């Protein structure tokens, strides 16, 4: 009765009314209808098609259609005699967006636990039970034609998934997978495999299996699917996915391989593909199928003929035997898996076992990517491949890996083999070399060549040393204890050298050290002993490599081989011995060197006269110090090489002029030095036409040294090469299908065609009737009449005389080395439009440089000569050490604290324009490419409570931090690519108790579980390992579906909305809320690509100050709703903390529209501000760039003292106000001071203008320098005549004291003329009291009162002068000022500040005239005031004595103003 009940339950298929499944819409690349005409069908097939269509119509699978889409339909007859209808959907599939595969491979039945009972079912007409989306049905219409079109065709469209549609398998898998999902959730301890429409269920007991199957039946029926009752399997043997499954064993189903159909490459390709598919079950090693794989070699045409060789027939027989006998085992879910690696012939073999039961085989491909693949590398590759397979099968790494290596060999492999390190990366199991004792693996054919036995990696002691060499003439030789020359059939120097090494290994039966000048041969010989040699289409190379491997393996004594550079002319016995080997294969080398030393003949002449290779000839010329400047320079990126003299380099091409008729093939040649053009019209472009054209060119232009052409057949033929060799002409070609290498002649083609059109359409010469006459007229115009840009002579004159005017020839220049990314100094050889040829220095080849990579070299002037060439301001990059950023809060934010920040940071800053370069990616914050974007980040303190309602009390901190580009990096491949995990303790799972105090947060330096990417683009990759927490639903233990997406309780990360607008957050869910990441840690971003730099834990303090930090407090409560627990989190903003972040000198913040250009590695910013601090008033529409000033330079950020528009007018006005009668001695001293002050204030005014608008550039300073001496000498004479008339300067003393505060800091306009076009003037901002303040207070309000305390005034002036300024006699001061102002040009300053200064200059002249009149009047007042004269004389004596004393000090010198 019990068994009858089970049978009844198994036969139950369900009869409940079900809802149709919801269709999945398709995505289309285009909505334009696709119509493919239906082809005619025979009457028999047409009748069958009508019957099948009516059948499908009755079942509701199709419906009548009037769709504008159409696909052909046809029928085929099965072996049973039934007909099957198929639709050709290739055209429709082409416009469907693919969904992608959901199951990229077959599931392995070996993972089914052993002895578990099984049930296997097949879904009936699965595709036809799944509906199409209504809007997609019309796309799958088809037409049933009528014979002779005697009636309208019948049209239908599919309502269900049609067979052959691109996404039908994916949609089918999705529908079936949805139907099985409740079964998987309810019976999670059962093992269910689903592939397309085949379903396998396994359970530990029979009863549980019946329960699972019954539930599965109902779910499948509810989903609208039907089970094929005749395909239910309930007893062994089971057949599933081509396998025969028993209680413990799994075998391949019996199949027969037909050999009579194996005739073409396509046939064998399909056969080997099928065999490879089942090899993991059969266990056929790669070496056992080598002959079958060899049949695939040769012609790649799929229809090319292939023959089944006897050896390959034996291997097919082996496959058939394995199909009959091979078996694998189902696993024990409680036992661990192991991986065994066997050192089989050809390549290693891997076996996955459990105890002694075989689970699966693993093999490497027969063909490799590299020419030589070391056996140890193959083992490592197989380990990595099989580890991934095991993880895919069961989700875990193997517990043990057994390898054919000793413990010491494994240790050495970890040290020396990169492939081994990759294959065993992150493996934590056991690595062993003891294989299990079983006979199932004994049939494997093992090899002993795993690690090198004969080849050594270090030189051998007390061994012979042999030098080898080979030549392209076929000679191979070695020298050492004896010499030998071998004649080989090879025309390759490397193959001849390979023969020399093989001969040495055969001739010397003892330990030897081999030295070769071929790096290729050295590397091949080192690796060949244990390597798998890749098959090559070159039979000669295959023979050589196989002979080399056999020779090495047959040796009884070890050898060592190394590489030496040839033709280096270095001293020492190794170089001499290698030259001796060279002489054995090329005795002409010495003669070529002697001839070049005598005549300096070029490389082409040496190659033609002597039997030397091109490399040897070029080496001789390049090592000659006399020839390097005349040798054709090497090519730089972006520049077409040009000749340095006439006929050094030609470019030649063929263009077409259709109007010439039969002679439309115009052959054009241009000399790249003079741009002289010659062209001939031919009837074709074959080699004979090219030679005819060149002979014409030789008659007109001469014979060139080198010609560059494209890869046309006329230029690449042997006849053309022979023709060039007869004329001793070198020939090169450009990159195929890329005309940029022929840019000069391509542009010449366009110029010539344009000239022909001009002369034909607008010329008056009617006598030029033939094509050659028209061509000659155009060439005469271009060569003898036209003068091109940047030239002063015609192309013909340049070609005949060899003289080319270059305005920059011989000048020093800065040129950029793109390889090293550095700027170097060189000398210009020639200069053209967009290019230049530069000589880097002695014994170096010239290089061609595009003009965008050139800068003029300017001799440093003034104090700049003594300074290093570094920019005034440099950006702080990710490779620099982290800087300190100070905050004004020590409770909520960690870091250095400084409360002395400016009270109003928004008022600081100067407007500047800046343009600087960088080497490594700069640190930039804001919305811009290359800048890190700020965003909101949350940190949480979680305090458990004892309340039955409230589960937790949360104290959360929200603030600005750095936005990740993506969320958590769960991608395994990327985690492996990081190759490191920062050192440091992981973030704690629970917050320390002391951090639960909401008044103080304990910030820790901890590492999160995974990194986030802050930036990943052309500027580099920036990552951060700081924890980033979010609330999420805890769905663990739930049986129903539960959303698991993380939800952020904080404000939106859009920075356009202020944090202050959010006061409350509420989160509700039927599931408890959990915090995703514990720990309170600051972000620590670092660059990992293209370079790896240090961490920068300080940057986030700049972002956190841009908005208030917010403190949230709240509880998570638990209540009951609908008989279910309901969780609510209420968070309220309880506190906001304003912050201010600052940097300190020499660091600054450049704020504005910063643009970073990675191609030129420059940073530009117009109208930016210089800041030291930011706070919540900062607008993130701007960007922040961290910069560092040059050492010893202070950049002004606060200058609340405005500059006068015209300092000279102000000085003279002050002088006129306080003209008094004074001693002439004291006047001279004050004159010197005034002149110095005029110069200083002029310099300061110009510096202020430069600081505000960045007007100063290199040209500006050069202009200034040229005219400075003449202008200032003239100005000095005028000022001196004026100064002789001044008697007293009472108010000027006060004004002088004010200016001395600035003068003591020695204004300097510090620029680097060769590396930067931007100047910033340093000025120290200091509000401390100055000594001259006392003098000012003593004299203020005394304009009309002459009763001064002269003694006290003298004492104050003396103390102030002694502390700040040394007054010396006037003549010395004038000379010192004139010398210090040698590089100051006020004319350029006048031009810069515009018409306002012109008016000021006019006012100065007027004031000077008025001053002369006043001075005349004051001379009359001297006789009326004797007591005043005596007072002034006293001051003069004081000044003289003071000046003399100070002048003796070597430390204190005259007033200098440096520019």
UniProtKB/Swiss-Prot annotation:
It comes from the Eukaryota. Its EC number is 2.7.7.49, 3.1.26.4. Keywords: DNA integration, DNA recombination, DNA-binding, Endonuclease, ERV, Hydrolase, Metal-binding, Multifunctional enzyme, Nuclease, Nucleotidyltransferase, RNA-directed DNA polymerase, Transferase, Transposable element, Zinc, Zinc-finger. A motif (YXDD) lies at residues 195-198. Residues 642-803 form the Integrase catalytic domain. It catalyses: DNA(n) + a 2'-deoxyribonucleoside 5'-triphosphate = DNA(n+1) + diphosphate; Endonucleolytic cleavage to 5'-phosphomonoester. One of its GO terms (biological process) is DNA recombination. It holds the Pfam family rve. A zinc finger (Integrase-type) spans 587-628. Gene3D superfamilies: 1.10.10.200, 3.30.70.270, HIV Type 1 Reverse Transcriptase, subunit A, domain 1, Integrase, C-terminal domain superfamily, retroviral, Ribonuclease H-like superfamily/Ribonuclease H. A motif (LPQG) lies at residues 161-164. Mg(2+) 2 binds at residues 469, 582. SUPFAM superfamilies: DNA-binding domain of retroviral integrase (SSF50122), DNA/RNA polymerases (SSF56672), N-terminal Zn binding domain of HIV integrase (SSF46919), Ribonuclease H-like (SSF53098). Residues 460-590 form the RNase H type-1 domain. One of its GO terms (molecular function) is structural molecule activity. Zn(2+) binds at residues 596, 600, 624, 627. Residues 57-245 form the Reverse transcriptase domain. Mg(2+) 1 binds at residues 469, 497, 517. Residues 811-859 bind DNA. The LPQG and YXDD motifs are catalytically important and conserved among many retroviruses. This protein is synthesized as Gag-Pro and Gag-Pro-Pol polyprotein precursors. These polyproteins are thought, by similarity with type-B retroviruses, to be generated by -1 frameshifts occurring at the Gag-Pro and Pro-Pol genes boundaries. Has a type 1 genome. The HERV-K(HML-2) family contains type 1 and type 2 genomes depending on the absence or presence of 292 nucleotides at the 5'-end of the env gene. Type 1 genomes lack a pol stop codon, leading to expression of a fusion protein containing a portion of the Env sequence. Early post-infection, the reverse transcriptase converts the viral RNA genome into double-stranded viral DNA. The RNase H domain of the reverse transcriptase performs two functions. It degrades the RNA template and specifically removes the RNA primer from the RNA/DNA hybrid. Following nuclear import, the integrase catalyzes the insertion of the linear, double-stranded viral DNA into the host cell chromosome. Endogenous Pol proteins may have kept, lost or modified their original function during evolution. Belongs to the beta type-B retroviral polymerase family. HERV class-II K(HML-2) pol subfamily. This is Endogenous retrovirus group K member 7 Pol protein.
């Amino acid at each position: 009765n019990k068994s009858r009940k089970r049978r009844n339950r198994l036969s139950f298929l369900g009869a409940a009314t079900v809802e149709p499944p919801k269709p999945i819409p398709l995505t289309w690349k285009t909505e334009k209808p696709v119509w493919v005409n239906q082809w005619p069908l025979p009457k028999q097939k047409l009748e069958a098609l009508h019957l099948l269509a009516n059948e499908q119509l009755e079942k509701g699978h199709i419906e009548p259609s009037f769709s504008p889409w159409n696909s052909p339909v046809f029928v085929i007859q099965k072996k049973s005699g039934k007909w099957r209808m198929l639709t050709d959907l290739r055209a429709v599939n082409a416009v469907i967006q693919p969904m992608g595969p959901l199951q990229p491979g077959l599931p392995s039945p070996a993972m089914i636990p052993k002895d578990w009972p099984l049930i296997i079912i097949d879904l009936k007409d699965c595709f036809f039970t799944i509906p199409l989306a209504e809007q997609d049905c019309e796309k799958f219409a088809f037409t049933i034609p009528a014979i002779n079109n005697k009636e309208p065709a019948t049209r239908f469209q599919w309502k269900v998934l049609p067979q052959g549609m691109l996404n039908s398998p994916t949609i089918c898998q999705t529908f079936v997978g949805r139907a099985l999902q409740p079964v998987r959730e309810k019976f999670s301890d059962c093992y269910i495999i689903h592939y397309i429409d085949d379903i396998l269920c396994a359970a530990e007991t029979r009863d549980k299996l019946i329960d699972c199957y019954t539930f599965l039946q109902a779910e499948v029926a509810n989903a609208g699917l039907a089970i094929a009752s005749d395909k239910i399997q309930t007893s062994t043997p089971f057949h599933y996915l081509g396998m025969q499954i028993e209680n413990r064993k799994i075998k391949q189903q019996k199949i027969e391989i037909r050999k009579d159909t194996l005739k073409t490459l396509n046939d064998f390709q399909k056969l080997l593909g099928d065999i490879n598919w089942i090899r993991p079950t059969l266990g056929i090693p790669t070496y056992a199928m080598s002959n079958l794989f060899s049949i695939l070699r040769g012609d790649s045409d799929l229809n090319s003929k292939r023959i089944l060789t006897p050896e390959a027939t034996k291997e097919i027989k082996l496959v058939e035997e394995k199909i009959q006998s091979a078996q694998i085992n189902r696993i024990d879910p409680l036992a661990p898996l192991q991986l065994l690696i066997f050192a089989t012939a050809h390549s290693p073999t891997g076996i996955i076992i459990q105890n002694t039961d075989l689970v699966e085989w693993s093999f490497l491909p027969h063909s490799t990517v590299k020419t030589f693949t070391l056996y140890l590398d193959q083992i490592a590759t197989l380990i990595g491949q099989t580890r991934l397979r095991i993880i895919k099968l069961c989700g875990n790494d193997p517990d043990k890996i057994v390898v054919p290596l000793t413990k010491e060999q494994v240790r050495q492999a970890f040290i020396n083999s990169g492939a081994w390190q990759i294959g065993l990366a992150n493996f934590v199991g056991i690595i062993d070399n003891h294989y299990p004792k079983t006979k199932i693996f004994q049939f494997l054919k093992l090899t002993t060549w795993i690690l090198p036995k004969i080849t050594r990696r270090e030189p051998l002691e007390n061994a012979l040393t042999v030098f080898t060499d080979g030549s392209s003439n076929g000679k191979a030789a070695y020298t050492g204890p004896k010499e030998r020359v071998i004649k080989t059939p090879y025309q390759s120097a490397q193959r001849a050298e390979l023969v020399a090494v093989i001969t040495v290994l055969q001739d010397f039966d003892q330990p030897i050290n081999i030295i070769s000048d071929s790096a290729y041969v050295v590397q091949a010989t080192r690796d060949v002993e244990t390597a798998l040699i890749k098959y090559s289409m070159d039979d000669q190379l295959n023979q050589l490599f196989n002979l080399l491997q056999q020779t090495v393996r047959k040796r009884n004594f070890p050898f060592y081989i190394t590489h030496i550079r040839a033709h280096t002319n270095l001293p020492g016995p190794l170089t001499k011995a290698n030259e001796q080997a060279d002489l054995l294969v090329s005795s002409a080398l010495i003669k070529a060197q002697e001839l070049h030393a005598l005549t300096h003949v070029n490389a082409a002449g040496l190659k033609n006269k002597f039997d030397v290779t091109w490399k040897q000839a070029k080496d001789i010329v390049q090592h000659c110090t006399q020839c390097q400047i005349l040798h054709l320079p090497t090519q730089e990126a972006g520049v077409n090489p040009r000749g340095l003299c006439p006929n050094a380099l030609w470019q030649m091409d063929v263009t077409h002029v259709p109007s010439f008729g039969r002679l439309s093939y115009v052959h054009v040649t241009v000399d790249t030095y003079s741009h002289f053009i010659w062209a001939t019209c031919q009837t074709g472009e074959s080699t004979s036409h090219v030679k005819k054209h060149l002979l014409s060119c030789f008659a007109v232009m001469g014979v060139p040294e080198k010609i560059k052409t494209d890869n046309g057949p006329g230029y690449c033929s042997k006849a053309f090469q022979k023709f060039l060799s007869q004329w001793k002409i070198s020939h090169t070609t450009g990159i195929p299908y890329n005309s940029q290498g022929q840019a000069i002649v391509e542009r010449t083609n366009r110029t010539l065609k344009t000239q022909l059109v001009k002369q034909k359409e607008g010329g008056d010469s009617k006598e030029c009737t033939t094509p050659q006459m028209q061509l000659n007229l155009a060439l005469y115009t271009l060569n003898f009449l036209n003068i091109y840009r940047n030239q002063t002579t015609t192309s013909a004159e340049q070609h005949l005389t060899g003289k080319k005017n270059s305005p920059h020839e011989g000048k020093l220049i800065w040129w950029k080395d793109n390889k090293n990314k550095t700027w170097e100094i060189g000398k210009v050889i020639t200069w053209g439009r967009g290019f230049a040829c530069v000589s880097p220095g002695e014994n170096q080849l010239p290089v061609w440089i595009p003009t965008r990579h050139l800068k003029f070299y300017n001799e440093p002037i003034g104090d700049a000569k003594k300074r290093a060439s570094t920019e005034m301001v440099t950006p702080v990059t990710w490779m620099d050490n982290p800087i300190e950023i100070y905050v004004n809060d020590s409770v909520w934010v960690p870091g250095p604290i400084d409360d002395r920040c400016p009270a109003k940071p928004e008022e600081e800053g100067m407007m500047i324009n800046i343009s600087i370069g960088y080497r490594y990616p700069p640190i930039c914050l804001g919305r811009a490419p290359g800048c890190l974007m700020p965003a909101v980040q949350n940190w949480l303190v979680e305090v458990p409570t004892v309340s039955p309602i409230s589960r937790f009390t949360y104290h959360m901190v929200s603030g600005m931090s750095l936005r990740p580009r993506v969320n958590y990096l769960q991608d395994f491949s990327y985690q492996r690519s990081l190759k490191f995990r920062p050192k440091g303790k992981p973030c704690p799972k629970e917050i320390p108790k002391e951090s639960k105090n909401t008044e103080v947060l304990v910030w820790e330096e901890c590492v999160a579980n995974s990194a986030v990417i802050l930036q990943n683009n052309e500027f580099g990759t920036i990552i951060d390992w700081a924890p980033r927490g979010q609330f999420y639903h805890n769905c663990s233990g739930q049986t129903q579906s539960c959303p698991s997406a993380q939800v952020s309780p904080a404000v939106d990360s859009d920075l356009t909305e202020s944090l202050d607008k959010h006061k409350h957050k509420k989160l509700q869910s039927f599931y408890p809320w959990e915090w995703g990441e514990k720990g309170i840690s600051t972000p620590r971003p670092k660059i990992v690509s293209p370079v790896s730099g240090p961490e920068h834990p300080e940057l986030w303090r700049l972002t956190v100050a841009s908005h208030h930090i917010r403190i949230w407090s709240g509880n998570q409560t638990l209540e009951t709703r609908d008989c279910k627990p309901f969780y609510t989190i209420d968070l309220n903003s309880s506190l906001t903390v304003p912050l201010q972040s600052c940097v300190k000198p020499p660091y600054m913040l450049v704020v504005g529209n910063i643009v970073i250009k990675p191609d030129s590695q420059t940073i530009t910013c117009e109208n930016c501000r210089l800041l030291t601090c930011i706070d919540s008033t900062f607008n993130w529409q701007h960007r922040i760039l961290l910069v560092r000033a040059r050492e010893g330079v202070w950049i002004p950020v606060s200058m609340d003292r405005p500059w006068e528009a015209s300092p000279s007018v102000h000085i003279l006005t002050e002088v006129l106000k306080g003209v008094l009668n004074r001693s002439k001695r004291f006047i001279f001293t004050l004159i010197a001071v005034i002149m110095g002050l005029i110069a200083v204030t002029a310099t300061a005014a110009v510096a202020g203008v430069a600081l505000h608008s960045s007007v100063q550039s290199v040209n500006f300073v050069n202009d200034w320098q040229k005219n400075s001496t003449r202008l200032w000498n003239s100005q000095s004479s005028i000022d001196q005549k004026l100064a002789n008339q001044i008697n007293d300067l009472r108010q000027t003393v006060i004004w002088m004291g004010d200016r001395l505060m600035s003068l003591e800091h020695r204004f300097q306009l510090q620029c680097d003329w060769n590396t930067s076009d931007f100047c910033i003037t340093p000025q120290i901002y200091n509000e401390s009291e100055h000594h001259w303040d006392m003098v000012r207070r003593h004299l203020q309000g005394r304009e009309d009162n002459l009763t001064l305390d002269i003694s006290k005034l003298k004492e104050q002036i003396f103390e102030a002068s002694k502390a700040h300024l040394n007054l010396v006699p006037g003549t010395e001061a004038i000379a010192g000022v004139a010398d210090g102002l040698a590089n100051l040009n006020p004319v350029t300053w006048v031009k810069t500040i515009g018409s306002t200064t012109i008016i000021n200059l006019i006012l100065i002249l007027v004031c000077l005239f008025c001053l002369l009149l006043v001075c005349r009047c004051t001379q009359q007042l001297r006789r009326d005031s004797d007591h005043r004269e005596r007072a002034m004389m006293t001051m003069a004596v004081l000044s003289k004595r003071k000046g003399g004393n100070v002048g003796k000090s070597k430390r204190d010198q005259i007033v200098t103003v440096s520019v």
